[in-house]
Design a protein with these regions (language model features):
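Small/flexible residues
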Residues: 4-7, 32, 45
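Short, compact, well-ordered microdomains
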Residues: 51-73
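Intrinsically disordered, low-complexity segments enriched in small/polar residues
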Residues: 1-2, 18, 51, 64
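Short interaction-prone segments
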Residues: 34-57
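Assembly/interface hotspot detector across virion components, adhesins/toxins, and nucleic-acid enzymes
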Residues: 5-7, 20-22, 58
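Short linear sequence motifs
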Residues: 10-13, 46, 59, 63
Length: 73
């Protein structure tokens, strides 16, 4: 599995981090969005978009980070 993340600002809430869980071929399997300031986590177990868009803009992420956030709730 491969894991990636990216951040973008959300007005009034701070940074929103989107994390991607991908197969070895970079097919997106699951995604989640986490806003650390508010503690919000939105999980998408079967995302509509299955291909990473502009993967060169993403940062590597750790499996532990993704699974810890996925298990919250």
């Amino acid at each position: 599995m491969l894991y990636f993340k990216c951040a973008q600002p959300v007005p009034g809430k701070g940074e929103a981090w989107t994390l991607y869980e991908c197969g070895d071929d970079q097919t997106v399997l699951r995604t989640l969005t986490h806003i650390p300031v508010t503690g919000e986590v939105t999980r998408v177990p079967d995302p509509i978009v299955k291909k990473l868009y502009r993967p060169e803009m993403l940062q590597p992420a750790e499996a532990e980070e993704f699974t810890a956030l996925w298990g919250e709730g």
